[in-house]
């Protein structure tokens, strides 16, 4: 991997060196051309003023390159030289100009021309020429072509390996199918070099076409064969057109002479037959020229000699080839039967049929013999296979038993070797552990000795320090007592400030309590809460407790305990009136409940019972004891109209409980300060 990563960097380095050398040579050639042209100019200052820095750098590069590579190559002249100099690479001739070089070239830059002769400073050097884009474009095109070629070759290679990619590549990539087929053909020729050779060098067997058979025109199978032989076509001339011809044919006379003398009755019969095409097509045979036509019911006599048709071959076998041959022969027989000269070919066709039947029987017998021979060969092959399989199983068992014995011996040998090696390792580990334990004990003893020495030295130092500080012990005690007095003074100041704040806060809380309990009617206590909040400062507990109070409570006031009990008694009477009402009660139910409440007896306080009377009794008892929280819980257990009637009373009790809880939290905030005062008082 390291070699592969270094190779591209080396190639890039060599390419950079080549490009640098080429650019240097191009610059040297241009400079030589400019210096050759400068001989015709009036002065050499224009060249130096146009390209001073560029020529100097080129001269330096060229001089160092020529001095390092060739000693016989002349160094380039300075920019102030006015002589025409040939390009680099030509051997140095003798200088003939008065201003030529008298010493060999060196790497030192030539002196610049004196600036006193010029009236203005030289212009700044021109910017370097832009790099040519031609080389970059050509390189990019070359890389693109190489990449496309590699990708195309990779696609062809992968198409030969993968069927899915083969389908994609041959369908969508131009000329992909031709390339893949070409490489597949090369691979086929490489694997089978003699395949095409046998095909090309195989001599063509002579084709046995047999005797040439000529079939006359208008012969073969036709739709006319299926027509009724007893019918006649009145549109064509023939023997059916004249009864004389039929009679002559029967008597053996000349048909031609008889047909040339038609009778009047024949003409009338032909006209009648041609005019009435829908009638029967049976022609009426005539026995004599002077007699009238015979009736249609009389059977027709044949005009020509009857030709016996050749029977087609029956299907011999189920073999498709023989059946195809049978169809061909039957087709030939049908063609012959359609011809008028079928009687002439009856004997050869019959002989051919016999030969064909014999051939079919021979093929059947050959097939049977081949089938029997194949069955025998299959049986022999089965027997040979069974024998070979038995022999193979026996050999496999023998080899397996031998390998098992060898493996067992090797296993025992390896087990003994492993046991011996583990015994040696255990022995070595035990010896090492013993040595490490002994060394550890020695190290612990040395550490204990060092610790004892350190402890002894520290004890000595402690005693010396105690003796040294004995004189200053009383001074240290006095300074400590003074510091304690200062702390006590600062603490008393804090206690006094906290005491004042606590007293003020206690007064504010008591003012809130008195405002809640002393008034006969509810009144707002916003000022008292503001005083408590201002005295508490930024304490989060007190602020949270005051924020938890419902604004309606301190804006309108809350009832006192006596007012809550008095209102409960009025609400209880109304609840008793509606205690017997269901949830969906009407006017009649309200009236009935009102009348029944007049005769109901009031229960005493009981510890159990979920009826309305029991809940009201327990609530009244709790209110007399001052337990508003439990009383509110009892009233909250009501359902239906009873709970609806006591909803306002529960809201007032809830506001009272919220205010009391907030005041209790404020009182708990005062407890740490009170305990601190008690502590300092005891101290």
Curated annotation (Swiss-Prot):
Keywords: Coiled coil, Membrane, Mitochondrion, Mitochondrion inner membrane, Transit peptide, Transmembrane, Transmembrane helix
Transmembrane segments: 140-160
Coiled coil: 367-444
Compositionally biased region (Pro residues): 110-131
Ranges of Basic and acidic residues composition bias in the record: 263-300
Primary subcellular site in the record, as a coarse category: mitochondrion
Polar residues composition bias: residue spans: 61-74, 93-109
Residue ranges that the UniProt entry lists as topological domain Mitochondrial matrix: 12-139
GO CC, any one term: MICOS complex
UniProt GO BP: cristae formation
Pfam families: Mitofilin
Function: Component of the MICOS complex, a large protein complex of the mitochondrial inner membrane that plays crucial roles in the maintenance of crista junctions, inner membrane architecture, and formation of contact sites to the outer membrane. Plays a role in keeping cristae membranes connected to the inner boundary membrane. Also promotes protein import via the mitochondrial intermembrane space assembly (MIA) pathway.
PANTHER family with a match to the protein in the record: MICOS COMPLEX SUBUNIT MIC60 (PTHR15415:SF7), MITOFILIN (PTHR15415)
Self-association and partners: Component of the mitochondrial contact site and cristae organizing system (MICOS) complex.
Name of the protein: MICOS complex subunit MIC60
Natural source organism: Trichophyton verrucosum (strain HKI 0517)
Upper taxonomic lineage: Eukaryota, Fungi, Dikarya, Ascomycota, Pezizomycotina
Gene for this chain: MIC60
